[in-house]
Amino acid sequence: MALTLLALLSVLAVQETHPAPASPPQGTGVVIREADTVVRQPPPHRGEGMSTAYRISDGVPNRAMEFRKRALHPGASIGLHPIAHDEVYYVVSGQGVVTSDGVETAVKAGDAAYLYDGNVVGVRQTGEADLVLIIAYPLAQRKD
């Protein structure tokens, strides 16, 4: 009995100092309320102007991807930056220009810009209304 208890305590001590990698939650997953994710901030990557960020996936435990919504207010832009993964910018509303490796393409509601690993990308709002985007990309691979 004492040996069994000692073995159990040893296992618990090892688990305490070297926890197993987290697993995704079981069941329905995680539901995020958009209203809980809103942050008014300057756009990333040295962009100009002001934006509203909806950092939707930030609170998801052990996530493998980033999923965000961003409203670029009139005159705002996400600055040019290199990407180390594929990214998708889906236009929910408004108008803008997406730049990928120096090529500028006008986008509007319903358009999706698929941007490739290694590209230098950015986006700017044009027109009178906010440019509202859904942005999705993978995070670094988990080592489970």
Q: Residue ranges of each PLM-predicted region?
A:
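Bacterial N-terminal signal peptides
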Residues: 2-13
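A short, N-terminal "cap"/entry segment at the start of jelly-roll beta-barrel domains
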Residues: 12-64, 143-144
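Ligand-binding loop in jelly-roll beta-barrel domains
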Residues: 61, 117-142
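Conserved short histidine dyad/triad with adjacent acidic residue
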Residues: 66-83
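Glycine- and acidic-residue-biased ligand/ion/polar-headgroup-sensing regions
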Residues: 84-96, 101
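Short acidic-glycine-tyrosine-enriched beta hairpin
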Residues: 103-118
